[in-house]
Amino acid sequence: MLDLNITKLVTTVVIIAACCLFYLLALDSYCDQGGTFSTGICAITTIVPW
């Protein structure tokens, strides 16, 4: 039973990490095309190494 819970936890963390990665990729592409946000969110994409 404990192994099943650990597997669910690891799967959830991997899915959340993948979603964050794809979101940052899309945001980086948007900001590179000249898009801006009033909150300065495009400044975050300068940290991303790609």
UniProtKB/Swiss-Prot annotation:
Alphabetized, the UniProt keywords read: Cell inner membrane, Cell membrane, Membrane, Repressor, Transcription, Transcription regulation, Transmembrane, Transmembrane helix
InterPro entries xrefs: MgrB (IPR020907)
Membrane side Periplasmic: residue ranges? 28-50
Question: For this chain's UniProt record, which GO biological process terms are given?
Answer: negative regulation of phosphorelay signal transduction system
Cellular localization per UniProt: Cell inner membrane
Q: What is its main location?
A: membrane
All disulfide bonds of the chain are none
Family designation = Belongs to the MgrB family.
The protein's name is PhoP/PhoQ regulator MgrB
Q: Which organism is it from?
A: Yersinia pestis
Source gene? mgrB
